[in-house]
């Protein structure tokens, strides 16, 4: 059964009530695009004239809405009309940019304060969604027309424009000098999250440095005073940026904080954190995910249960097959190369098993490790095997040295395969 549309006069009354009571959460809810619903069921635009004529709609809004919010409400309704009536995501996006710019002016003038941050959040959030919609619609249109883009910057025009606009919102938040009770600084971490999402989508990780530097310069309230969801956003994106910069120790630390603070009922968010935290823990701490943990996240389990099995057993063949099977997904999330880096751990476990089978001797011929690699499905010449052994020793996966005169690996008598290796 479809939801009954909300009559426009009831909608106006709700807006005015929210403004009068300074209920910014309710105001934000009524200025949001209800993406999960059929847009045609949101508002009843069938009041005579309002659907067919933008001029009549403007007049209706001006007569019905509190003065300071007239333009914002009108722009929001026009965004909905572009989506519902015209099916034009590009026009809807353009109108939302006007809405955002108008709202920024309200904040800059002081008519909007930190009390109105929920409205800023939803306007910026919808702006990002509309930019993605407009971007995807443009790509589909070009594909249908078989147009090849020469200028890549033109292809990302909406996303880049949105990043600049949301960066302005971030500046509005961090540069506020009002008392903390009404400060816009409370919006810094949420807006930072939206901005980082866009930078990562645009593959412009370096731009996150400017944001982080700005956050260090200004005096923000202690992070423990912010909503927990904002703190999770902050640590999650710090972890992702560190991960993409191959600073895996910092990434692991930040993602651990994000995971510990994230609400345990938000499985999707937990899965996003784990999708980066698990590979960093494997690489940095050699800690493999447990079956109990993976049982709660089927998507992760399909990748990491076979991968964990291969790593533990030193089965290079299965390790390679697992990466190959999930290559598209892992490459898309930029995790593939990190997991490829855990191949050394797989080799270490294979060589350790070989050492145990050979009675834990401190002297083993290079040919023994060559045979072990052959059994694991990797047939290599002896010189290549020596290079792998040298790499294992230099990285700390093995303790010992190679005696080339005797083609022998001389292992340490004490803990020749240490568990904790700095990477």
Swiss-Prot record:
What is a single molecular function from GO for this protein? RNA binding
Residue ranges of domain PCI in the record: 232-416
- UniProt gene name: csn12
List the PROSITE patterns. Answer: PCI
What is the similarity comment for this entry?
Belongs to the CSN12 family.
Q: What is this protein called?
A: Protein CSN12 homolog
A Pfam family of the record is: PCI
According to the UniProt record, one GO cellular component term is: cytosol
Which PANTHER family does its entry note? PCI DOMAIN-CONTAINING PROTEIN 2, UNCHARACTERIZED PROTEASOME COMPONENT REGION PCI-CONTAINING
